[in-house]
């Protein structure tokens, strides 16, 4: 064998070996959906109580790991960045997220894309811990993204440990992590999210029924089959809980447009990210969506936010599903101009029948 060819083969063998070693390492350290069933709960400070007939407020907000504020774009949406331009910007976003949650003062808050542990993309900010300590509320947190090193793009995303979090003014009786079907196969799956539902159970006074609050963040970057399968699993779970006599509310980032959302905010460029669609017909009799189209709940991260730009794409993909024994009082998107996240908070007010 000629020496140049031998050198090339050695180099190729080393590259293949390194890639194989990386895949083995990532596979061994990824979030294991078969064993990751526990939800981390904190606090014994919350003392509010609720009963049938009471009013309840619930906030949902995808906070974008404090990395997708007005200054940012994102490579998966047609932008270039993998995180906020600087740690100072990420800190600004996190400060704004905490202060906004405190100002809206909901009885329960559903957060998505909040880091469970320090992550590269959020400059090591202790996001879940900050939210717990600064609000002083009882919390539940379930991870849906754990990867020791996401190797793409260039520069890479790096280490990620993130998930969904619920804040409660009432004591949390229990909480679960329920795995959702994934559209991704190995090896792509090792660096992707492992989506889940996180139901939190709140005891109600004067009844054996519970208030079941389901925090969710459904699939984003798939061909649509993942969203459909996860939505079907969500529907099945909600019906099971309602059949037990419980009051059931699901909320979060559906990554699917609510009815009428595309009429208000039509797709401008179908070559960029396009959400799935939700339809009222998917819900059983008596169930309903709760959402607000008066302001967008999400923007496309193809560029830093510019409300006046023709390239700016808005969506309505954040909202709620209510069981028949839950009466909708109001739902309003809090239009904050996407200062701290690429999503706006959505505030729901309901009454337990």
Residue spans for each PLM region:
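N-terminal, active-site-proximal structural segment of metallo-dependent hydrolase catalytic domains
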Residues: 3-133, 137, 141-152, 156-161, ...
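Metal-dependent phosphoester-hydrolase catalytic domains
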Residues: 5-11, 23-46, 236-249, 256-353
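A well-ordered secondary-structure block
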Residues: 36, 148-211, 215
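Active-site beta-strand/loop signature of hydrolases that rely on acidic residues for catalysis
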Residues: 57-63, 93-121, 167, 200-202, ...
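Solvent-exposed loop/turn segments at secondary-structure junctions
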Residues: 63-66, 115-118, 145-148, 172-173, ...
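Surface-exposed cleft-lining segments at the edges of enzyme active sites
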Residues: 80-87, 114-117, 181-189, 217-225
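Conserved beta strand-loop-helix elements of the APE1-like EEP
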Residues: 133-136, 159-175, 202-203, 311-327, ...
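Conserved S-adenosyl-L-methionine
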Residues: 139-147, 175-181, 330-334
């Amino acid at each position: 064998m000629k020496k140049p060819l031998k050198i090339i083969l050695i180099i190729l063998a080393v590259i293949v070996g390194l890639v194989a070693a990386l895949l083995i390492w990532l596979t061994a350290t990824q979030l294991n959906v078969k064993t990751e069933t526990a939800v981390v709960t904190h606090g014994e400070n919350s003392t509010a109580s609720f009963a049938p007939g009471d009013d309840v407020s619930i906030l949902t907000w995808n906070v974008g790991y404090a990395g997708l504020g007005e200054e940012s774009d994102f490579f998966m949406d047609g932008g270039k960045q993998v995180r906020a331009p600087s740690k100072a910007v990420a800190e600004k976003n996190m400060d704004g997220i905490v202060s906004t949650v405190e100002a809206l003062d909901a009885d329960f808050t559903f957060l998505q894309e909040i880091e469970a542990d320090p992550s590269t993309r959020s400059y090591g900010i202790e996001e879940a811990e900050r939210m717990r300590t600064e609000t002083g509320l009882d919390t539940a947190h379930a991870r849906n993204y754990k990867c020791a090193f996401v190797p793409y793009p260039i520069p890479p995303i790096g280490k990620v440990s993130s998930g969904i979090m619920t804040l409660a003014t009432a004591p949390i009786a229990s909480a679960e992590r329920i795995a959702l079907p994934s559209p991704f196969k190995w090896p792509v799956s090792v660096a992707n999210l492992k989506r889940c539902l996180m139901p939190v159970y709140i005891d109600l006074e004067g009844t054996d029924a519970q208030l079941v609050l389901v925090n969710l963040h459904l699939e984003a970057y798939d061909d649509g089959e993942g969203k459909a399968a996860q939505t079907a699993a969500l529907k099945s779970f909600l019906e099971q809980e309602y059949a037990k006599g419980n009051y059931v509310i699901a909320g979060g980032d559906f990554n699917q447009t609510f009815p009428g959302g595309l009429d208000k905010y039509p797709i401008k460029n179908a070559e960029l990210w396009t959400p799935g669609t939700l339809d009222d017909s998917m819900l059983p009799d008596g169930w309903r969506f709760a959402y607000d189209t008066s302001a967008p709940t999400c923007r496309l991260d193809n560029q830093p936010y510019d409300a006046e730009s023709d390239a700016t794409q808005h969506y309505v993909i954040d909202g709620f599903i209510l069981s028949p024994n839950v009466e909708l009082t109001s739902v309003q998107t809090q239009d904050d101009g996407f200062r701290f996240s690429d999503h706006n908070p959505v505030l729901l007010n309901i009454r337990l029948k």
